Amino acid sequence: MDLSRINTWKSKQLKSFLSSKDTFKADVHGHSALYYAIADNNVRLVCTLLNAGALKNLLENEFPLHQAATLEDTKIVKILLFSGMDDSQFDDKGNTALYYAVDSGNMQTVKLFVKKNWRLMFYGKTGWKTSFYHAVMLNDVSIVSYFLSEIPSTFDLAILLSCIHTTIKNGHVDMMILLLDYMTSTNTNNSLLFIPDIKLAIDNKDIEMLQALFKYDINIYSVNLENVLLDDAEITKMIIEKHVEYKSDSYTKDLDIVKNNKLDEIISKNKELRLMYVNCVKKN
């Protein structure tokens, strides 16, 4: 039996099929009639099959909601959700339907799932399988921006730092700015932002990324300045300029991490660094 052309069947042939014992069986390609109806975005046929009991007779390897989430049109997703399909179900790859909506860049479908349950963006068999992380990996600024706007409270800092790591690693500046804007707006510790992967941006010599990072009050004091100087004077100058900014600012200069750091000692022992520091102070 080949059901791949079921969307072209006449009503008489379809009626005969629906009354047969083969209605919910897999065809020679391993797919059900519902699979082909969704693939063709055939809303009427999907409804007909659902009324016939398709959801109670699903094949083990088919996940209709996940499949429908890849469609640009949201009608079938709405119908399946209304029919009682579980939006938090994982498929055989460990993904939710929202994951596939993100993968396809279907913003309207993404919104449909998130409005129903915003926590879905963090569902996944592992942290790397969540829809939120997937959107970051895809560098989809629009979807991540929407996700962040729908979170009613702050979320796990470890997730955020992991996303920032991926963003810096991939050199996605706009995504990094979006994540740091969110991190800054939710920072209640009255301290500099701790971004462990600033060293990664330095090692990658990603000047554009560093310039964007240094627009925020991030912790620069985990960097070994002497090692950086041997490798890249331009980046060293950026770090010293940020250090001078912190020491001059009425708020940041009183932070313990600014008052008690190793940079001043390192600078004092190096003629080139001292000259760079003095020049930065004069310009500030």
From Swiss-Prot:
Record's subcellular location: Host cytoplasm; Host nucleus
Q: Supply the PROSITE patterns for this chain.
A: ANK_REP_REGION, ANK_REPEAT
Q: Spans of ANK repeats, please give.
A: 29-58, 60-89, 93-122, 127-157, 159-188, 193-222
Q: Gene Ontology terms, cellular component aspect? A: host cell cytoplasm; host cell nucleus
- Induction text: Expressed in the early phase of the viral replicative cycle.
Keyword vocabulary terms for this entry = ANK repeat, Early protein, Host cytoplasm, Host nucleus, Host-virus interaction, Inhibition of host innate immune response by virus, Inhibition of host NF-kappa-B by virus, Repeat, Viral immunoevasion
What the entry lists under InterPro entries is as follows: Ankyrin_rpt, Ankyrin_rpt-contain_sf
Main localization (coarse): host cell
Its biological purpose: Inhibits antiviral activity induced by type I interferons. Does not block signal transduction of IFN, but is important to counter the host antiviral state induced by a pre-treatment with IFN.
Q: Which family does it belong to?
A: Belongs to the orthopoxvirus OPG039 family.
What name does UniProt use for this protein?
Interferon antagonist OPG040
